[in-house]
């Protein structure tokens, strides 16, 4: 599932969701892109 990163923009309707939901921790080579912490899942994307 996709998720909204912090820099995707504040407007949920027009923002592009560039992140991917990952369980607990992001995969190697990925970074958490959402400041809000949830114990169940993180919003991650590939490191540039």
UniProtKB/Swiss-Prot annotation:
Cysteine-cysteine disulfides: 3-43, 5-33, 26-44
Domain of life: Eukaryota
Annotated GO MF terms: sodium channel regulator activity; toxin activity
Entry protein name: Delta-stichotoxin-Hcr1e
GO biological-process terms attached to the record: regulation of signal transduction
Pfam families, per database record: Toxin_4
UniProt entry tagged with the keyword Secreted: yes
Cellular location(s): Secreted; Nematocyst
GO CC aspect terms: extracellular region; nematocyst
Originating organism: Radianthus crispa (Leathery sea anemone)
Family classification: Belongs to the sea anemone sodium channel inhibitory toxin family. Type II subfamily.
Record key words, sorted: Disulfide bond, Ion channel impairing toxin, Nematocyst, Neurotoxin, Secreted, Toxin, Voltage-gated sodium channel impairing toxin
